């Protein structure tokens, strides 16, 4: 039987103890299935652990079983597992942010709430479903939101961009509240704010004492300032500070999530604002615009404007340069500084 694509079978494991080895990581995760790969990312010079790694299972069902059994504790430390994001996706808005709310585009007039509930219930426990309608006409605007009780269903759903719901092709994205979008924007500058693990000035520890105490840190930091693991089979970050916390913060100086500007439901904002033509009235280049523009809605939620999310400039070899998981590229900031799981 042909295996599912690797991107559906791989987990990023953050917050590892520096004492955790590949053997102890493997031993822990093998309780949920057979691993085809397991790695603790290390500094190439000192060979010291960078505090994160990846495990790849033989099936997505095993990943689901592992994620259903959270929290995970390895070598006396609670770790943070997340479904890994492939390199080609990691530069897109929303790739690494952790949210419980899902944006669903391409909703047709004959699609009702129960269609969304029936489809998405298999992924996890649904809290709320909202299909956005026009205030005057009552017609559906072509999009809606599904909120789960956990971030993992959203992470799993967006691994596959298109879903067929009620016979129609729908596109899914992570949704951010306006406040979350503003936090991400403020963190782009690499200063101030309190988005996630702390001050982006960094300099000292990882998860612990030391100036900054963020994912970036100095030589002991969550990535040692060299980039998110220098890549891992196309799933990492390139060298140069764009790691789990390059000082520019969430997405770096080149845009960050949304690249600034108004958000979804703000005047002139719109979903994407140039990213795949969202917000310009053409959801997916005109495919989903039956009900007009997606922008200027009263909703406070939605993925934001364009810009990059961590960058995607570095390519490189198997262990040298992709953009996998919470990781940026070449100093553009990557996942860290103030990221949140």
UniProtKB/Swiss-Prot annotation:
Gene3D superfamilies: 3.30.70.330. The keyword Transferase does not apply. The modification N6-acetyllysine is found at residues 156, 161. Residues 296-335 are annotated as: Nuclear targeting sequence. The keyword rRNA-binding does not apply. The disordered region, when incubated at high concentration, is able to polymerize into labile, amyloid-like fibers and form cross-beta polymerization structures, probably driving the formation of hydrogels. In contrast to irreversible, pathogenic amyloids, the fibers polymerized from LC regions disassemble upon dilution. A number of evidence suggests that formation of cross-beta structures by LC regions mediate the formation of RNA granules, liquid-like droplets, and hydrogels. This is Heterogeneous nuclear ribonucleoproteins A2/B1. It comes from Saguinus oedipus.
């Amino acid at each position: 039987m042909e295996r599912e694509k690797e991107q559906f079978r791989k987990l990023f494991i953050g917050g590892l103890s520096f004492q955790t080895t590949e053997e102890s990581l493997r031993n822990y995760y093998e309780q949920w299935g057979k691993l085809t790969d397991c790695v603790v990312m290390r500094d190439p010079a000192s060979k010291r652990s960078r505090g994160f790694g990846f495990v790849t299972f033989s099936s997505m069902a095993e990943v689901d079983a592992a994620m259903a059994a959270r929290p995970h504790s390895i070598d006396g430390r609670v770790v943070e597992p997340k479904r890994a994001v492939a390199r080609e996706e990691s530069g897109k808005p929303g790739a690494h942010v952790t949210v419980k709310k899902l944006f669903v585009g391409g909703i047709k007039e004959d699609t009702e709430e129960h269609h969304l509930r029936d489809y998405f219930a298999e992924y996890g426990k649904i809290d709320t479903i909202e299909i956005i309608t026009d205030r005057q006409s009552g017609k559906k605007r072509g999009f809606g939101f599904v909120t789960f009780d956990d971030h993992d269903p959203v992470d799993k759903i967006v691994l596959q961009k298109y879903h067929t719901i009620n016979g129609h092709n729908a596109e899914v994205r992570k949704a951010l509240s306006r406040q979350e979008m503003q936090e991400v924007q403020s963190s782009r500058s690499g200063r101030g704010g309190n988005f996630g693990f702390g001050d982006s000035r960094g300099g000292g520890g990882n998860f612990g004492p030391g100036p900054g105490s963020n994912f970036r840190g100095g030589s002991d930091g969550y990535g040692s300032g060299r980039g998110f693991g220098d890549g891992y089979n196309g799933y990492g970050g390139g060298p140069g500070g764009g790691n789990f916390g390059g000082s520019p913060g969430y997405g770096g100086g080149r845009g960050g999530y949304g690249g600034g500007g108004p958000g979804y439901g703000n005047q002139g904002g719109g979903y994407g604002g140039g990213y795949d033509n969202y917000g310009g009235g053409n959801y997916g280049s005109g495919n989903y615009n039956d009900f007009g523009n997606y922008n200027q809605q009263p909703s406070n939620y939605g993925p934001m404007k364009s810009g990059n999310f961590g960058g995607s400039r570095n390519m490189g070899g198997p262990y040298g340069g992709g953009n996998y998981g919470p990781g940026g590229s070449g100093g553009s900031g990557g996942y860290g500084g103030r990221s949140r799981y």
